Amino acid sequence: MTNSRPTPRLSRRTIITGAAGALGLAAAGGTAWALDRYLIEHTDVTSASDYQGLPGTQASGTATATATSAGDGVIEGTTYTSSDRQITITPHSSGSGNSAKAWYVADVKLNDVTALRNAFAKNSFGTNIIEYPTAIAENVGALFAINGDYYGFRDTGIIIRDGVAFRDEPARQGLAIMRDGTMVSYDETGTNAAKLISDGAWQTLSFGPTLVDGGTVIEGIDTLEIDTNFGNHSIQGTQPRTGLGMIAANHFVFVVVDGRSAGYSNGITMTDFAQLFVDLGARVAYNLDGGGSTQMVFNGSLVNNPLGKNKERGTSDILWIGK
């Protein structure tokens, strides 16, 4: 494992610095604003794990929460089985040339959904804070992890992690993983963090869109955009993607589809991604940050091949499960 600096999000950061050079940015204030908004780390909460897992709290407490585990598990290849959790990762591929696709499915069954945890890059909540997924996973003792919603590139959204509200700025369609093991999509602008926690939210994610509801692909997802921030890729077209779905309470599927790599995997459209979850039996499914951020980790190593380059890219958060 390397301790070198995480790869910047080139699709955004290179655009910003490149544009600055091309234009000369005569107004120094414009340069300072861009650096502050997109590159400079801003930490709102340090030692974030000290606050997570405390029911109904805001990120202002001092106690430390620890994940529970039976500790009797066995790893065989990309499968983990214990008395309270099962993880099975399978590779898939189809097509060739420009129609090639490669994806990985993690089928996860838990006795208790609180085994599905969140971790922030550098154990800090804020903006522009990134770290390699394998490094975040190692820091918390994760066996399995996927990239999250990259909350740190935005300052909006309802962000509840491990039962703790870190941000309450409703903006888009969110997803809640409830303490009863179910998943629910919702309009953030119609609720707030306190209400969601009161209703039993364990994790919330703020990216989207919702792909599947009631076992059916959501209509119109092929035209939706999530963020219009400068430097953002469109989420439409054929792209690498990360998502999660719920088959039944405490039974989840996590899917990463590689892309932007000719001959290996071109990626997948939003509608086809949603259909993939339906084919897996998901009743609800939700789209997370994709592109070069699409990354799955198991037992300390990358499972997929981001952008066909076998290289990690720094991200702001992961969802993870321990042994």
At which residue positions do the language-model features occur?
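Short, solvent-exposed aromatic-acidic interface loops
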Residues: A121-G126, G190-A193, V257-S261
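Zymogen propeptides
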Residues: T2-G174, T182-S185
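A short, polar/proline- and glycine-enriched secondary-structure boundary/capping micro-motif
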Residues: G126-I130, A194-G200, F230-N232, G263-I268
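Short, glycine-/Ser/Thr-/acidic-enriched flexible segments
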Residues: N111-V113, Y151, T182, G190, ...
